[in-house]
Design a protein with these regions (language model features):
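Secreted/extracellular small peptides and ectodomain modules produced from precursors
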Residues: 1-2, 70
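Short aromatic-glycine-(Arg/Gly/Cys) micro-motifs in beta-strand/loop hairpins
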Residues: 21-36
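Acidic, low-complexity, intrinsically disordered interaction modules
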Residues: 52-112
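Short, Lys/Arg-enriched N-terminal segments with co-localized hydrophobic residues
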Residues: 2-21
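Acidic surface patches and DE-rich sequence motifs
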Residues: 6-8, 31, 82-86
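Short acidic DE-rich linear segments
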Residues: 133-136
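A short, exposed loop/beta-hairpin motif centered on an aromatic-Gly-Thr core
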Residues: 36-47
Length: 136
């Protein structure tokens, strides 16, 4: 459940949050733009998706800095399954305060209970990357 200070906000946010938890979520990742296949990983929460996306991005950068890959043009995101339409759509969530369609923005916001944990995780993962070794 999302954190709130106002009881009336809690009810609206809880309903929206439960809709998201009840929906199916997956991370999609293309490790090299131009390939025809997409790598999918099911996740339980947007925060879990954020951690996985950060891990995949750091891993690709790590391979690039250590000459495992000669170049790296990757892309990824989080999708949610709409059971009514029976199709996958880019993730989004609406709170009383804001409409989020950017996972990074949501995970840094006051609406995300795990914002501090996710920031620490991202720092820990990306501190292994020497960005000066990554070509522009």
């Amino acid at each position: 459940m999302l954190c709130c200070t106002d009881e009336s906000k809690t009810n609206k946010i809880t309903i929206l949050w439960e809709d998201i938890i009840m929906s199916k979520l997956r991370v999609w990742w293309i490790p090299q733009i131009g390939i025809n296949e997409i790598f999918y990983v099911p996740v339980n929460t947007p925060e879990e998706g954020k951690k996985l996306l950060d891990t995949l991005a750091a891993y690709d950068a790590f391979q690039l800095q250590n000459n495992v890959k000669s170049d790296c043009f990757n892309v990824g995101g989080l999708q949610m399954f709409d059971e009514e339409d029976e199709d996958w759509y880019d993730w989004n969530v609406e709170t009383d305060n804001y409409f989020y369609d950017d996972l990074d923005e949501y995970c840094k916001s006051e609406d995300c209970e795990q914002a501090e944990e996710l920031e620490n995780f991202q720092k820990e993962v990306f501190k292994q990357i020497d960005w000066s070794k990554i070509p522009d």
